[in-house]
């Protein structure tokens, strides 16, 4: 009996510890006020690359005219596609606004479009370029090839921004757009129109803003990440306030993601030689992406290519970007389980039109898959229950000799071919599936604002009235009452506390996950009724 209790307690503690370890409470992110979307990107002050600040901001004065240029006034260029609206500025050649058309801040028809970038100060624009060697300033004024770009369906469009530096360099930034893709091409071209050969690197400055947004879940986090040397490197926001992070080998991309959206710079044929990540202000993460060093002789030119991504953390869309960009979604250890579950949910959604129904179907399928293990588990518990009288006799017989009692109990197990752990081990196999599904539901953009029925309007958010977790706790209680046990009454009462513990744990879980666990419990009760009739 003690072994059963110890195993149950250890499993319960293990689940709670695993819960805390896998889903740690995120560190608070103090930021200035202002309600914005869950993730907003902008560019922090862009000083010279050799002396990037660790904290604080510095206002940027109005830029002086570049050599060979007449004074000019900065203008906006609007790019409109089926998926987003972007606004670029001729000051700095950067991005000042980016709005997603397919995603809303809140559920329902009144929800506003998600805004990923929205800056009014020129020193906060995204995608600014800087190079001390070539005289390229993040504050330079550019001439634009057009005042507006409109791309629909599968069409293509481009925007060319050009400036000339005092070092005799004509610098071009060419953005290319597709009407049906979030991917934006960026070519930075250095043309030497002077008389002296120049050597240097061009830095692309990309800051992602960390905003004090309303969290949709307790475990929503912000995280800069970089794929370098074949591994995804995650950086802690608080650590970045103290110490910058730098990567300089085999860099495929650098990104910043929140729960549902991401901005990233993806290398093209080794176009990123170094990434330096700092936190120049509480509300910003600065990524200084440096190109390889290039030498440009008089009359020659050199081009550096990138892919820019602003959009949803949709597994299929991210995979299309190449360079393992889909790994910007951090599923932790349960990625091999979470990804197939996401693809399965998407497949079922095509036929059901409701992700809640898709989750229920997935639950049925998983129950069928695990039926042999569950059946074996309950059969083992039944067998243990039958041996309870004999175990009580052995305990009484060898009450003064624990070693002899243990040997006798093990011999009893061997004689009746009973595995004392047979009731627990099959259950342990299902725990990774539970956590994998948790990750899939928590970070799947498809479930964001996806309704089920009645009061459940967002399967990625908690049940607003806590109805489903309470019912789930009740079914767990019924399930435990039906489960064979060889515990004494006191131990059994202790185990009945587990449904209460799990109910409180599930109160703030995504409603889609609670539906899975609730349906799973109902199916388990039906299965237990069947086993109780067939296994005697």
Swiss-Prot record:
Q: Domain of life here?
A: Bacteria
GO-annotated molecular function: membrane insertase activity
* A Pfam family hit: 60KD_IMP
Gene3D superfamilies of this UniProt entry?
Answer: 2.70.98.90
Q: Keyword Cell membrane, does the record have it?
A: yes
Q: Keywords assigned by UniProt?
A: Cell inner membrane, Cell membrane, Chaperone, Membrane, Protein transport, Transmembrane, Transmembrane helix, Transport
Q: How does it sit in the membrane?
A: Multi-pass membrane protein
Which InterPro entries would you find in this protein's record? Membr_insert_YidC (IPR019998), Membr_insert_YidC_N (IPR028053), YidC/ALB3/OXA1/COX18 (IPR001708), YidC/Oxa/ALB_C (IPR028055), YidC_ALB_C (IPR047196), YidC_periplasmic_sf (IPR038221)
* Example of a GO cellular component annotation carried by this entry: plasma membrane
Where can this protein be found?
Cell inner membrane
Q: Where are the transmembrane segments?
A: 5-25, 353-373, 418-438, 495-515
Record keyword Membrane present = yes
- State the Gene Ontology BP annotations: protein insertion into membrane; protein transport
Q: What is its main location?
A: membrane
Subunit: Interacts with the Sec translocase complex via SecD. Specifically interacts with transmembrane segments of nascent integral membrane proteins during membrane integration.
Q: What does this protein do?
A: Required for the insertion and/or proper folding and/or complex formation of integral membrane proteins into the membrane. Involved in integration of membrane proteins that insert both dependently and independently of the Sec translocase complex, as well as at least some lipoproteins. Aids folding of multispanning membrane proteins.
The family this protein is said to belong to: Belongs to the OXA1/ALB3/YidC family. Type 1 subfamily.
Q: What is this protein called?
A: Membrane protein insertase YidC
What species was this sequence derived from? Geobacter sp. (strain M21)
Name the encoding gene, please: yidC
């Amino acid at each position: 009996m003690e072994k059963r209790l110890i195993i149950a307690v250890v499993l319960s503690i293990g689940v709670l510890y695993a819960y805390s370890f896998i889903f740690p409470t995120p560190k608070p992110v103090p930021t200035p006020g202002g309600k914005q979307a869950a993730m907003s990107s902008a560019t922090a002050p862009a000083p010279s690359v050799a002396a990037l600040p660790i904290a604080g901001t510095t206002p940027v004065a109005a830029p002086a005219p570049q050599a060979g240029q007449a004074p000019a006034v900065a203008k906006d260029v609007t790019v409109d596609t089926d998926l987003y609206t972007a606004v670029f500025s001729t000051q700095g050649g950067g991005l000042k606004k980016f709005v997603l058309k397919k995603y809303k801040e809140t559920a329902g028809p009144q929800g506003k479009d998600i805004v990923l970038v929205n800056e009014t100060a020129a020193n906060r624009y995204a995608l600014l370029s800087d190079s001390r060697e070539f005289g390229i300033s993040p504050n330079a004024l550019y001439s634009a090839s057009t005042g507006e770009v409109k791309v629909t369906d599968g069409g293509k469009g481009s925007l060319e921004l050009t400036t000339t530096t005092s070092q005799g360099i004509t610098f071009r930034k060419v953005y290319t757009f597709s009407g049906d893709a979030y991917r934006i091409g960026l070519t930075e071209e250095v043309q030497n129109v002077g008389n002296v050969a120049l050597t240097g690197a061009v830095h692309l400055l990309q800051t992602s803003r960390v905003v004090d947004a309303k969290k949709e879940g307790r475990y929503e986090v912000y995280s800069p990440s970089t794929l370098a040397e074949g591994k995804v490197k995650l950086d802690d926001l608080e650590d970045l306030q103290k110490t910058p992070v730098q990567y300089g080998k085999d860099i495929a991309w650098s990104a910043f993601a929140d729960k549902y959206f991401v901005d990233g710079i993806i290398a093209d044929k080794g176009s990123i030689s170094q990434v330096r990540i700092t936190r120049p202000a509480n509300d910003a993460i600065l990524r200084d992406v440096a190109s390889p060093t290039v030498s440009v002789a008089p009359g020659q030119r050199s081009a550096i290519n990138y892919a820019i991504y602003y959009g949803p953390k949709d597994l299929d869309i991210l995979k299309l970007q190449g360079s393992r960009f889909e790994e910007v979604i951090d599923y932790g250890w349960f990625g091999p389980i979470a990804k197939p579950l996401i693809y399965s949910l998407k497949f079922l959604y095509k036929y059901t039109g409701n992700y809640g129904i898709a989750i229920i179907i997935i639950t049925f399928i998983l129950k069928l898959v695990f039926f042999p293990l569950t059946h074996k588990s309950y059969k083992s518990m039944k067998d243990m229950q039958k041996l309870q009288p004999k175990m009580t006799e052995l305990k009484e017989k060898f009450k003064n000799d624990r070693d002899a009692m243990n040997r006798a109990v093990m011999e009893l197990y061997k004689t009746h071919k009973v595995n004392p752990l047979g009731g627990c081990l099959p259950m342990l196999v299902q725990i990774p599936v539970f956590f994998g599904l948790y990750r899939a539901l928590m970070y799947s953009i498809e479930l964001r604002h996806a309704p089920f029925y009645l009061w459940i309007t967002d399967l990625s958010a908690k049940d607003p009235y806590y109805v489903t977790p309470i019912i789930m706790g009740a079914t767990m209680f019924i399930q435990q009452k039906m489960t064979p046990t060889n515990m004494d009454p006191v131990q059994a009462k202790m185990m009945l506390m587990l449904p209460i513990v799990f109910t409180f744990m599930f109160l703030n879980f995504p409603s889609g996950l609670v539906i899975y666990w609730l349906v799973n419990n109902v199916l388990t009760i039906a299965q237990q009724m069947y086993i109780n009739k067939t296994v005697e």
